[in-house]
């Protein structure tokens, strides 16, 4: 459910992006959108991982949507946005994009750890089976 609600927010965000007239801001927003979609693909594949990226859902996603809606509204009403405000928005979008990449890395690291654990378990079982076979063979050849 958390994933679906978050994805709905990204879809709302995606609808805002084309309406942004400032090409630099629109470009940064598209980058953030791409990174968010990659993260959601990972989460749909492994829904249990949502706990690992909880801060994305509890803070970043709502903030992203809020600042985007406010900026789009200002543009729509013809307001002149100060250069400092524009630069701050771009900076925040870049930071959110980086945070999304970090969240993706966090999920991949978890998958890597799971794979390593599974490989170690398989290796241990195979080693034990090999040792057991050796013992059984030695008993067959030398019962005493």
Where do the PLM segments sit?
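Membrane-proximal, non-transmembrane interface segments of integral membrane proteins
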Residues: 1-44
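Long amphipathic all-alpha helical oligomerization modules
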Residues: 41-53, 58-144
